[in-house]
């Protein structure tokens, strides 16, 4: 089998396509959450904490010298990233929880008993005939 045919077989499997769609949607969702945190959540928190802009919070390790930028630890951006992660993790948790509850409901649905096999039907007929002979 040629390399191209193998790749087509691999790429056309449902799991690979589902994974690709999930990655694209996940990336878009991450951007939405980042904007939500940076533009909606953090400004009111900054006002409550005395007009702090979290994205500007940093510790300067070395001041800028000439063309070289300052060396800083940008812990404000880190705080925003942690909040982003927390919201995304919670959303994923809630989605998985919903999916798992749907799976449980499907599993809990009572299954119809399997139809008896021909051997079982034949044995039942023999049993019924033997009972009928004993009653005579």
From Swiss-Prot:
Q: Where in the cell is it found?
A: Cell inner membrane
Asked if the keyword Cell inner membrane belongs to this entry, the reply reads: yes
Annotated membrane-spanning segments are 9-29, 79-99
A Pfam family reported for this protein in Swiss-Prot or TrEMBL: MscL
Q: Which GO terms fall under molecular function for this chain's record?
A: mechanosensitive monoatomic ion channel activity
Chief place of localization: membrane
Q: What is the recorded membrane topology of this protein?
A: Multi-pass membrane protein
Q: Please list the disulfide bridges.
A: none
Which keywords fit this entry according to its UniProt record?
Answer: Cell inner membrane, Cell membrane, Ion channel, Ion transport, Membrane, Transmembrane, Transmembrane helix, Transport
Q: Does the keyword Cell inner membrane apply?
A: yes
**Xref: InterPro entries:** Mechanosensitive_channel_CS, MS_channel, MSC/AndL, MscL_channel
Task: Kindly state one GO CC term assigned in the UniProt record.
Answer: plasma membrane
Summarize the protein's role.
Answer: Channel that opens in response to stretch forces in the membrane lipid bilayer. May participate in the regulation of osmotic pressure changes within the cell.
| Family recorded in the similarity comment | Belongs to the MscL family.
Quaternary structure annotation from Swiss-Prot or TrEMBL: Homopentamer.
Quote the NCBIfam families the UniProt record gives: mscL (TIGR00220), PRK00567.1-4 (NF001843)
Name by which UniProt lists this protein: Large-conductance mechanosensitive channel
Give the source species: Shewanella sp. (strain MR-4)
